[in-house]
Amino acid sequence: MKLTIIGFGEAGRAIAQGLSEEAQAPEISCFDIKTLDPSQSDTISQAARNLGVRNCTTLEQAVDGAAFLISTVTAGSALDVAKAVSSLRPSAQAFFDMNSVAPGTKRTEAELLEAAGVAYVDTAVMAPIHPRLHKTPMLLAGPNAETFAAVLSAWNMDVRVVGEAVGRASSIKMLRSVMIKGLEALTAEMGLAAEKAGVSDEVINSLNASFPGIDWAERTAYNLERMTTHGIRRAEEMEEVVKTLEELGITPELSEGTVRRQRRFGESKVILNSDELSLKQSAHKIFAKMDKF
């Protein structure tokens, strides 16, 4: 059984790594648009070799003969990938869209893939892809979700069907992200301001007392690292969240602010390691690199 992963970044590689360790592992191929960039192609090729994955140099080569397709690209590229795949009229049975995009975007993608004869499965990844890899909890939705959930379950993936309507899984993910990505932005704003004011210890102690069970210094340092590492991708996801809220008639005031802050941190080029750096250390690395926070 052949599986192709389109988009071989952090998520695509993690899924490939996990699946490759399964007894009933599919034969995995991948394609990433970065393969077409001479400055990045070697990185993609090496990552594929390390995982025993066949690296394809064109999308057409990647989808040819694949029974199942998984899309793990950026939110801004998800619809373009669906259009490109559907234009190839692939023989694949199903297309699992694991990208964080608005329900309306997924419904548009579904129309394209279904018209090309490929079942579309709205798939939402509900936790960080590490450390659980392919076993990270996922929600599935769509008229064929039950059928293809069995395929993923056979590979020991942790999936749950939440309905037959495309967009239902995405809605859950998008609205959860209002809180998750918004909390990242809030803690960044709080943590950096508190450190600038010289009162971070007092602020963190107060938060720890109000919300026992959460180490706010550790959480804030972790969130800062996530934003500087993945802020551009997170900003794209939050733009899809904004679309989702607007589709529901909810004014996305806070989420629009989250977009701006995530993108600013993602573009900062600051490199943090939350396992090694405290909140204070992370904050001062940011102060040294960024003019606007």
Task: Give, region by region, the residue ranges found by the protein language model.
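NAD(P)+-binding Rossmann beta1-loop-alpha1 motif at the extreme N-terminus of oxidoreductases
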Residues: M1-G65, R89
